[in-house]
């Protein structure tokens, strides 16, 4: 099984150049083609410009997913609702980047025979990772909790792509 989510110019310093980084990452896809396993499944983010380059040639199945398949219903402070495999999925995670990752994970789970209701239940219980789109609020029992008229989001985004994705998720908010 191979899952390709995206490729962005990150960790270049470890590879020397973007071209070398691309080559090193493509080697991972090649490992699936060369595998002796009977079932070799590649799950590919079809929205990424490098999708074709990361689609292994000798596999038994290629699953391409796109953001448009998610049919996003809502995205607000409580989370995101979207469509997957005929079911409405809710997750407390926000942003298209998280939906893309959930689509990859959902297709991965389906490839292993996990049913959609189980996937939906798991996604509904997801929590943000500290420092990645993490919302900070006053504690539930704090007397001023209901008067808090601002939202604090902590994110350690450090590339242009990740900052743009974060700003798109929290549009209209002031940024510091």
Q: Which residues are covered by each model-predicted region?
A:
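Short beta->alpha connector loops
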Residues: 48-49, 158-162
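Switch II (G3) loop of P-loop NTPases
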Residues: 152-158
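Active-site beta-alpha connecting loops in nucleotide-dependent enzymes
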Residues: 129, 160-176
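Acidic, Mg2+-coordinating active-site environments of NTP-dependent enzymes
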Residues: 1-151, 172-173
């Amino acid at each position: 099984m191979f899952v390709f989510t995206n490729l962005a110019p990150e960790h270049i310093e470890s590879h020397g150049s973007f071209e070398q980084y691309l080559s090193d990452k493509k080697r991972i896809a090649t490992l699936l083609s060369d595998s002796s396993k009977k079932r070799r499944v590649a799950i590919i983010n079809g929205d990424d410009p490098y999708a074709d380059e990361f689609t292994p040639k000798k596999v038994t199945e290629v699953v391409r997913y796109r953001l448009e398949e998610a049919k996003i219903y809502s995205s607000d402070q409580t989370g995101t609702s979207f469509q997957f495999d005929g079911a409405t999925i809710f997750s407390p995670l926000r942003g298209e980047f998280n939906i893309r990752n959930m689509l990859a994970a959902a297709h991965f789970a389906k490839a292993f025979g996990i049913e959609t209701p189980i996937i939906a239940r798991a996604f509904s219980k997801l929590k943000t990772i500290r420092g990645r789109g993490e919302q900070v609020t006053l504690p539930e029992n704090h007397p001023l909790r209901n008067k808090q008229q601002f939202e604090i989001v902590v994110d350690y985004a450090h590339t242009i792509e990740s900052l743009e994705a974060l700003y798109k998720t929290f549009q209209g908010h002031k940024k510091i």
